[in-house]
Amino acid sequence: MLNLNELKSGFHYFVMGWHFITQKGLRRFVIIPILLNTILLCGLFWLFISQISSAIDWVMNFIPDWLSFLSVILLTLSILTILLLFYFTFTTFSGFIAAPFNGLLAEKVEKMLTEENINDDSLVDIMRDVPRMLAREWQKLRYSLPKIIALFLLSFIPLVGQTIVPVLTFLFTCWMMAIQYCDYPFDNHKVSFDIMKTALGNQRTQSLTFGGLVTCCTFVPVINLLIMPVAVCGATLMWVENYRNDLGFNMNRSFSSQTGLDVRSENTGIVK
């Protein structure tokens, strides 16, 4: 069910992301994600332009003759599906490459909001976190890949593949964008992936609104070059205002006496 308050808050966090990237003290942490985003988007655009014609012809071959009168609508939906599949490719590569930089940006935004340190600022501490961040990106890929394959297989079904699948693909993309960018502040506190999904799912309208705005802006020229750090900043604000206290954290990473839970465990989510 649509929650209007969550709809507004999802929009609010996205807008605030734009505010944060202009803040003094954060700009130098924003530059690297923007440069990486620019390189990856240029590569994706070249790949899309070179392959779009063949991809459209391939998809349209699955439309039966008796639906030819809907060809324009179905063609549009097919192109949207292809765009979203290319987008998945982009986010997968960008997630792995930019993870350490996005994690650092999320850490600095949270420090600005709370005036409390999460980790040491030493290079050794940052490098120590890189393997964990990359493992987390692999975990997100393992979560999304079976669903992407399922949507891909559904696209072979006449009519369903050109009508329902684009809608499902868009909704799933919105959900994955919320997971992708909210994961950076969650992971900085070593919150398990499953607990993060549950937390975001408890405010699903907010998550889908935020992820939907990120997804849509990715297809807008110039804006898409900035969207990665914007999304990280907005997602970090969302974490601080919605989840940080509810998950029972203090900045010494001890678990809350109120819940008795430590959400840092990757295996069970509970420390006995």
Swiss-Prot record:
Q: What is its main location?
A: membrane
Q: Give the lineage.
A: Bacteria, Pseudomonadati, Pseudomonadota, Gammaproteobacteria, Pasteurellales
Q: Which PANTHER family match?
A: SULFATE TRANSPORTER CYSZ
List the molecular function annotations (GO) for this entry.
Answer: high-affinity sulfate:proton symporter activity
Purpose of the protein: High affinity, high specificity proton-dependent sulfate transporter, which mediates sulfate uptake. Provides the sulfur source for the cysteine synthesis pathway.
Tell me where it resides. Answer: Cell inner membrane
Source domain of life: Bacteria
**Per UniProt, which keywords does this protein have?**
Amino-acid biosynthesis, Cell inner membrane, Cell membrane, Cysteine biosynthesis, Membrane, Sulfate transport, Transmembrane, Transmembrane helix, Transport
UniProt topology in membrane: Multi-pass membrane protein
Of the GO CC terms on this record, one is: plasma membrane
State the InterPro entries in the record. CysZ_sulfate_transptr (IPR050480), Sulfate_CysZ (IPR022985)
Q: Which organism is it from?
A: Haemophilus influenzae (strain 86-028NP)
Q: Which gene encodes it?
A: cysZ
Q: Tell me which family the UniProt entry assigns to this protein.
A: Belongs to the CysZ family.
User: Which GO BP terms sit in this record?
Assistant: cysteine biosynthetic process; sulfate assimilation
Q: What is this protein called?
A: Sulfate transporter CysZ
Q: Which NCBIfam families match?
A: PRK04949.1
Cell inner membrane keyword on record: yes
Q: Does the keyword Transport apply?
A: yes
Transmembrane ranges, per UniProt, are 29-49, 66-86, 148-168, 219-239
